[in-house]
Regions:
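Conserved sequence signature across two-component system core domains
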Residues: 10-11, 34, 52
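Short amphipathic alpha-helix used as the core "switch/output" element in two-component signaling
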Residues: 42, 65-76, 97-98
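Two-component/phosphorelay signaling modules centered on CheY-like receiver
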Residues: 14-32
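Non-catalytic signal-transmission and effector/linker regions of two-component phosphorelay proteins
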Residues: 1-6, 112, 116-130
Length: 130
């Protein structure tokens, strides 16, 4: 990877945030890691990341959706991955299987938390086309 890609990572779980940020930095990415929707919105106002990975539910149940909407409104070309443990915690299946769902939510990909960091990086590379 010759270009250094910037990943905006927003999650209110400090352990998950640390683990993913550590792995992505080790893989050569610049990572801007924040713990809240408000912090992520401040980052979006100041810079354009190459890709974003948002927790679906942070301080509110729809934080990830709101961040996705705001990022895509400002930078429509920036891919967004929503990562969540909703299915594991509630048993409710959530996904972005149809184009209609992805268009409404504006996320490019949905991943269940617990995905291996290597798999997350593979998905990031696919979305960045590297």
């Amino acid at each position: 990877m010759s270009k250094i890609y910037t990943v905006l990572l927003a999650d209110d779980d400090p352990d998950y945030l640390f683990q993913v940020a550590f792995f992505l930095r080790k893989a050569g990415y610049e990572v801007v890691a924040v713990e809240s929707q408000a912090e992520a919105e401040q980052v979006i106002a100041k810079m354009k990341p190459d890709i974003a990975v948002f927790d679906l539910m942070m301080e509110s149940d729809d934080s990830g959706f709101i961040l996705c909407y705001k990022l895509k409104r400002r930078y429509p070309e920036v891919p967004v991955i929503l990562a969540t443990a909703v299915s594991r915690e509630t048993g409710i299946t959530f996904g972005l299987n149809s184009g209609q769902d992805r268009d409404w939510i504006r996320a490019d990909l949905y991943l269940e938390k617990g995905v291996r960091p290597e798999q997350l990086e593979l998905e990031i590379k696919k979305l960045l086309k590297i």
